[in-house]
């Protein structure tokens, strides 16, 4: 039975032919589905009109790529207008387990302080690797902990990706929604950290599972070393590097365990890119340009400040946080 108290918000950007099957799976678990499309071309619009127009599905066509943050905020505003208090946010290529919404909702209903919950997040299974990702939470002093979310337990965590998360719409309205000038990358992390500065909690629900694709990950062997790079395009390296600067400035001292993790993770994924990915020169230029623009406070859509030598990557409609310290 679908949960009529939950509205799904799916952000699309040139959805692939397998999207309708995932849409059907989501629709069976929620009361309504809102699709917010960032594609901005006739082919994608025709595809969605042919597969997504049903009684319980509504499509918002943005006409261009407004970024994942703006798309999520538009979806959240529409869900509130429809009377919903909770929304399930999803990327177009994420696939929930059959009981994911039921598991998230059950924990929400049993929580002693539901009014303090900003997000309930499922266990993330990386579809390309077939293994669970780890969460981040504070350890001793400034150290961080990277627990696996196993069994039926729940735990408070520092960050969660937007895809698969049950989003409290009252909390979303309370502290201003997702940061649209980030466009993409760190959108979910910034929202989680800001929520906690306002007294809200981020809760991981280990019984709920989401199968999620992080970039175009595949195994690369370098002698005895096995790496799993994401193969993001230069434009993603630009926004990652640019948005990291205001994140560290605003949250580094408040969340020292996150800052330590961020420093290590950023160094690792850059080294991994240099070792195992193509277009290294273009990506290094994008990192330098993004860092410079971040220092100058130049945010917004990346095309306004940086031209990607390789064009726009196909994953540009997403905002993955992922698990960068996972080889």
Where are each of the predicted segments found?
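Short beta-strand-to-loop acidic/aromatic patch adjacent to the donor-nucleotide binding site
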Residues: 84-95
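Glycine-rich, basic loop-to-helix element that forms the pyrophosphate-binding segment
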Residues: 62-82
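Conserved donor NDP-sugar-binding/catalytic core segment of glycosyltransferases
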Residues: 99-134
């Amino acid at each position: 039975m679908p949960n009529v108290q939950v509205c799904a918000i799916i952000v699309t950007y040139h959805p692939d032919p397998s999207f309708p099957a995932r849409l059907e799976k989501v629709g069976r678990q929620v009361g309504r589905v809102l699709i917010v499309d960032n594609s901005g071309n006739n082919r994608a619009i025709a595809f969605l009109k042919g597969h997504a127009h049903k009684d319980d599905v509504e499509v918002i066509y943005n006409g261009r790529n407004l970024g994942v943050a703006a798309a999520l905020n538009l979806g959240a505003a529409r869900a509130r207008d429809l009377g919903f208090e909770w929304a399930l946010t999803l990327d177009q290529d994420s696939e929930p387990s059959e009981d994911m919404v039921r598991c998230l909702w059950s924990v929400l209903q049993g929580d002693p302080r539901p009014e303090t919950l900003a997000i309930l997040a499922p266990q993330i299974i990386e579809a390309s690797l077939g293994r669970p990702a780890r969460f981040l939470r504070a350890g001793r002093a400034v150290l961080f902990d990277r627990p696996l979310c196993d069994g039926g337990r729940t735990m408070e965590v520092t960050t969660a990706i937007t895809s698969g998360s049950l989003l409290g719409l009252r909390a979303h309205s309370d502290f201003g929604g997702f940061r649209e000038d980030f466009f993409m990358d760190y959108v979910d992390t910034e929202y989680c950290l800001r929520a906690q500065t306002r007294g809200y909690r981020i809760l991981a629900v280990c019984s709920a599972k989401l199968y999620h694709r992080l970039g175009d990950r595949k195994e690369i062997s370098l002698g005895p070393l096995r790496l799993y790079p994401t193969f993001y395009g230069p434009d993603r390296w630009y926004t990652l590097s640019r948005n990291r600067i205001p994140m560290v400035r605003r949250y580094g001292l408040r969340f020292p365990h996150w800052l330590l993790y961020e420093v290590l993770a950023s160094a690792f994924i850059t080294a991994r890119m240099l070792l195992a990915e193509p277009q290294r020169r273009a990506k290094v230029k994008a990192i330098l340009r993004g860092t410079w623009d971040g220092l100058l406070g130049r945010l917004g859509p990346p095309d306004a400040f940086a031209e990607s030598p390789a064009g726009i990557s196909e994953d540009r409609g997403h905002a993955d946080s992922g698990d960068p310290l996972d080889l």
